Amino acid sequence: LKKRGLLLHKVGHGWTGEVLGYETVSWDQNLSPLAPEKQAMAAEIAGKRELWQGSPANTNLCFHCGDAVDSFADLVVEYAKSNPAVDYLHVWLADEYNNVCECEGCRQTTPSDQYVSLLNEIDRRLTAEKLSTRIVFLLYQELLWPPIREKLENPDRFVLMFAPISRTFEASYDFSGSEVPIPAFERNHIVLPTNLQENLAFLRGWQKLFHGDSFVYDYPLGRAHYGDFGYVHIARVISSDIKQLHKMGLDGYISCQELRVTFPNALPNYVMGYTLFDESADPQALIQEYFTAAYGERAEQ
């Protein structure tokens, strides 16, 4: 990677499960109950502190609990120390929503405020260890709502990652309409936005608070492609999305996708790669070029 001038991104989800004492490399259920000394670190939901549907990766923490914050920050710093080749370390929370802590302490603030406070603590510890690892923070589910009070104390440490997992792929981002407001946050009763204007509203809310490096982590080939049998429509959406990154105030694009998205063809990734390299690339020309190479005389069929 280094010889080729590439930057290494690592981790993502899984930290919360590790804090709770589980080796967390998947979303699988774990039948082992929480250890008594870990129970206070788990999110309290409906009066109970336990694994969310049995999955450590999907279980949130109680960030009012100092031990949870301390353990989380220590894990991140130890990982950074042990993996100096990592350029961008992704620090995400649980991979589920409507399952954040309901304890009295957590109710006094918001998940995003607690998240930013955690990120600041991680930054202080990385700085103390003289580690330059960049931290990628996540706009996703509850964390789409911007913080109310907290702000990142050392913005140069951080990279914003916008992850609109619930967006529609029927169309690309649209800037023609008027801006819409961010809906009120209701703890454990949020509805994820499918509307593109609403997704952009969340991004703009964070961009008012953070002006550093940023990119989108998007999902066109996660499952939306299943409804597009020839992959032509989704390839056009990908092209349009990439061409609008700068208008969205974003600096790059990561595709959260299945690896085997080549049936009946690999057109979407072909268009994605070329358009990221050259935003002026004509999607129709790329489609024609790909189909001619793949299907020869039958390209027009």
Task: Provide a role label for each language-model segment.
Residues L1-I242, L250-S280, Q284, A293, ...:
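Aromatic-lined carbohydrate-binding surfaces of glycoside hydrolases
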Residues G296:
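Extended ligand-binding regions for polar small-molecule ligands
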